[in-house]
Structures are given as structure tokens and as C-alpha cells.
Swiss-Prot record:
Job of this protein: Probable inactive acireductone dioxygenase.
CDD domains noted in UniProt: cupin_ARD
One GO biological process term: methionine metabolic process
Identification of the protein by name: Probable inactive acireductone dioxygenase 2
Pfam families in UniProt: ARD
UniProt xrefs under InterPro entries: ARD, ARD_euk, RmlC-like_jellyroll, RmlC_Cupin_sf
UniProt source species: Caenorhabditis elegans
Keywords: Cytoplasm, Nucleus
GO cellular component term of the entry, any: cytoplasm
Amino acid sequence: MVQIWQMEPYPCGDPRLPHHLFPPKKITPDELSKRTGTLYWKLDTLDQVALAKRLTTLKLEHSFKKEDIFTLDAETTANFDDKIEELFEESSVPFEQARMIIEGTAYYDVEDKNGQWVRIFCEYGDLILIPANTCFRFTTTPHNFVKMRRFYKDEDSE
């Protein structure tokens, strides 16, 4: 089951740690959608036909024309620490984007309408859709490895 929570307001230290509020404030996928517009699905990766249909539907409904595989691994990624720091910088892009985790684990942080950060723990089979113009950031977990499929609108969307 997906884990989503409101982050502490001023996280310090390693971004790859959970950074829960105390006590933790869990959030449901429905609340995530209402607060940030971000959509979440857990895909059945064992049923290849259903998976292909779901991804085809996603690409058609959201006009995703490009996709790639992105791997971030402490053992093979050059300048891993610099890359983690770069990816954890807040960013906002003028187009929606989707990410599906195919190996490893990661955190996606999305800013809600009140300026609070919501953290999504993403693992194998998780698919998230981040709306256009939504502030977000990304990092691995302490396992330091994630492999994902990234879906884009067109060539200029990376």
C-alpha cells in the first residue's frame, strides 16, 4: 500500500530520510489528489496485458508522446551526491508528467495549495502523475537506487 504523508515544515539533514511530522500525519491518495492534483495508481505488474492497457490509456488520455528509462544508482551514477542534490531542488514545469517505478524506491515531494510539502514513497509498480505548474522535488531513499519509466508530452518536455 502506498505511503503518503505531510512532511515536517523545515526538513534538515539527509533528504533521503522520511522527514515525517511528529506525530506522523498520513495522507490518502484521494487527499493527495485534492491537495496537490497529483494522481497515484498501484499497477499490477504481473498482469502484462492489464499493465500495457493501463499505460496505453495513460499515454492517450494525457497526450504523452515520449518516454524513457531513468536510473539513479549510487554505484553507477557519476557524481551521485551532486545529482541527488540537483534533483532535490524544487522545480515546476509547464506540463504534466508521469513516473512509474520499475525497480528500487524513491520519494516524490509535491507542494500542496497551502505551501505544505507532501511526501510520496514510491516503489515497484507505483505510478504518479504530477500536474503542470506543480512544485515538486525528488530523491532516492537510503537504498540509493531507483529505476523508473518517465512519460512526457513531447521532445521538449524533459
